[in-house]
């Protein structure tokens, strides 16, 4: 959609922002903050968090390749419907397999893949639940990044290096991309005066919380990755 169209009040089209990365890379933290900002701008937004969707929409699915793929397909279906109806759908899910993410892209259409990249050592440090420690000790099987593969995106629209960036930097990059692609009016970005919290400590705490909703005005579907 053109900038001229947005100035005339034409509703912006929906889009899916798909945040993928290792456990504790910062996907949920970025998704929550992004949803907060977009909600403050009165943009239609929904947050689909992988951990929460596991509890609601995919409750009964395990962590085999087949079950993981089915879980992502369910998230993709919901996100496609939201996108179709003009909503900015933010997905925060490990979604470890490249082929399944490519399926989601093909199904949804308006799709921005964001690789939330983080050094494995930093992910382990942030993991307040101790899941990495258990996986490294062999107490958890099929754990992404340790005993199960994570296939990095080959050509994502964006890469966020969360071990080196502050939270506001990562979120700002996504907002700028949304503006350049016509999904957010540019004047919103230019006039933004949002708080700028440091990433490292906040990211560590939020990432270990298992996800969550993005605050008032943002509803979170609860699911699993």
Map each language-model feature to its residues.
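Extreme N-terminal, non-catalytic leader segments
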Residues: 1-16
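Hydrophobic anchor at the beta1->P-loop junction of P-loop NTPases
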Residues: 19
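The conserved Walker
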Residues: 23
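Conserved lysine of the Walker
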Residues: 27
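Conserved substrate/cofactor phosphate-moiety recognition/catalytic segment
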Residues: 32-77
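Conserved beta-strand scaffold positions in the cores of enzyme catalytic domains, especially
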Residues: 47, 111-115, 157-159
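ATP-dependent NMP and nucleoside kinases share a basic, alpha-helical "lid"
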Residues: 56-63, 67, 79-135, 142
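Small-molecule kinase domains that catalyze NTP-dependent phosphoryl transfer to phosphate-bearing small molecules
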Residues: 117, 125-173, 180-201
